[in-house]
């Protein structure tokens, strides 16, 4: 149940990003920042149509991660036929949960980043500087490290 909730919630954030970007599209200037340095200062500008690149990338990433979640069992079964070993059902569920959590974190964090970019392009001012980069790295890598630790602890390798 938690997997479905997290997957659905991540998709909702992406849809909200598309809606927010579409609603504010007409109020965007012709040139908008499309790339930022480490401190969130714009270092590349593009046409306002390019503001949809980030939501499209986030949606493609979400679809890829969701398909990986959905077909993980088939992938594991295919892999185990070549390695002559089976993976436990607990390990499969644990890894599927990890994929779901990572998908949720990525879609949520990147959607908020996209909303911030649109808001700033329309004249707003949300400046969290390097903390945006740090937050994303800490959340993603702490999830990965925690997953690897639990895999090692439960001998899921």
Task: Give the predicted meaning of each segment.
Residues 1-14, 51-55, 96:
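Alpha-helical transmembrane segments and their helix-start/interface "positive-inside/aromatic belt" motifs
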Residues 81-95:
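Short membrane-interface loop/juxtamembrane segments of multi-pass integral membrane proteins
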């Amino acid at each position: 149940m938690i997997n479905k909730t997290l997957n659905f919630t991540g998709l909702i954030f992406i849809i909200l990003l598309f809606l927010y970007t579409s609603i504010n599209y007409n109020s965007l200037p012709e040139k908008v920042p499309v790339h930022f340095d480490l401190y969130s200062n714009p270092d590349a500008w593009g046409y306002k149509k390019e503001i949809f690149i980030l939501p499209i990338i986030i949606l493609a990433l979400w679809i890829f991660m969701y398909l990986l979640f959905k077909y993980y069992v088939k992938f594991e079964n295919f892999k185990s036929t070549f390695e002559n070993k089976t993976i436990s059902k607990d390990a499969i569920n644990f890894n599927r949960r990890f994929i779901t959590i990572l998908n949720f974190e990525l879609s949520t964090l990147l959607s908020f980043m996209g909303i911030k970019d649109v808001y700033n392009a329309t004249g707003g001012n949300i400046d969290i500087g390097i903390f945006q980069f740090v937050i994303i790295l800490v959340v993603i890598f702490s999830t990965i490290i925690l997953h690897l630790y639990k895999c090692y602890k439960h001998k899921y390798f």
